[in-house]
Amino acid sequence: MQLYLAAEAAETPDVDPRLRLVCVDYRFDRSFPQGLPQAPEGVMLLGGDLSARRVGEIGEECARRGLRAVLAGFGHSPALETARFCDGLLRRGLRPILTENAWQAGCGAEMMISSALSGGDLRTRLEEALGRCDGLCLDLERLRRSFPLPCPDGEGEALSARALADLLHRGAKPSFSEELMCKAFTAEIKGETRFVLFDDRETLRRKLRLAASLGVRRGFLLYPEWSAEDAAAAADA
């Protein structure tokens, strides 16, 4: 499985040669960034509302930089526009990758889904997704959330890295969830008992091993949510 580290051009870190860098500065509603280096076999990540009108320009930029795939679907993605977008990329020899919300059957795109779950079973989720799409990619979103008990909606609240570190320093005893493939513990937060889920390098490696065993093709990590050192450690999985 190929790993990608997505970062802004202005803060691009030095990375392990086994990883490929992805620039997050491309957007459908803006001029494309200038002067970015060659990225053979790389991926263009496009933010904003999906539009098929820029497929020609996308093809030219991908040819210039050696990119082979385009990841999109982070904003509004109408079904007809998405189908035209994917068709335009495929006709230019580019592989479309769409987020789960934008993906549709028959579009010829790989689907990207998040590895961060607060319920269910990650293996089952990956297996079901693989049965629906033309190829699966994993958004290795770093899970770091706390949940009230009970929590019917499963949403919870985001925890900062510092807040999580403080909870662990206070003596929390995390356990590993085989279903969610993350670590978990209960803690008192502002006088309330809450359930905490989080990822670290160990859970990242476990998720990658599971995904690779099922045939997932690509995994994307966001910098600085994951450091270059985290990404290098993940490449050892």
Question: Which residues does each PLM region occupy?
Answer:
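Chitinase-like catalytic core of GlcNAc-active glycosidases
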Residues: 1-121
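Active-site region of glycoside hydrolase catalytic domains
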Residues: 94-96, 105, 124-149
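A structural motif corresponding to the C-terminal end of an alpha-helix
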Residues: 62-65, 89-96, 128-135, 206-217
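Glycan-binding loop/region signatures in secreted carbohydrate-active enzymes
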Residues: 135-206
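Active-site proximal loops enriched in glycine and acidic residues that flank catalytic Cys/His/Asp
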Residues: 100, 140, 223
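Acidic/aromatic/glycine-rich contiguous surface patches that form carbohydrate-binding/processing clefts
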Residues: 212-237
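Flexible, active-site-proximal loop/turn residues at the rims of small-molecule/cofactor binding pockets
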Residues: 75-77, 142, 225-226
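Short acidic, glycine/proline-enriched helix-loop-strand junctions
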Residues: 79-96, 175-185, 228-237
